[in-house]
Amino acid sequence: MTRILLLLLRFYQYFISPLLGNNCRFHLTCSEYAKEAISMHGSIKGLWFTFKRIIKCQPFCDGGYDTVPISIKNSKPLNKKI
């Protein structure tokens, strides 16, 4: 499922997005955000993060730099014992 979603996103980025123009209010475009979210968190959770991001893409949101949240199991400890 993850591979299919990533292929669909790649298709969108190469063939559909250039026709629509560059009008994203966020630094990572929604399609880049979706690719990163799906790669990091899998298809279900990645789609959930993507859905929440697309909901934010509206005139009342300032936009800016928005990254995919890192899950606790994927993060590395900040303090290492020596």
From Swiss-Prot:
Its membrane topology: Peripheral membrane protein
Pfam families: YidD (PF01809)
Domain of life: Bacteria
Intrachain S-S bonds: none
InterPro entries: Membr_insert_effic_factor_YidD
Keyword vocabulary terms for this entry: Cell inner membrane, Cell membrane, Membrane
Protein name: Putative membrane protein insertion efficiency factor
Organism the protein comes from: Rickettsia peacockii (strain Rustic)
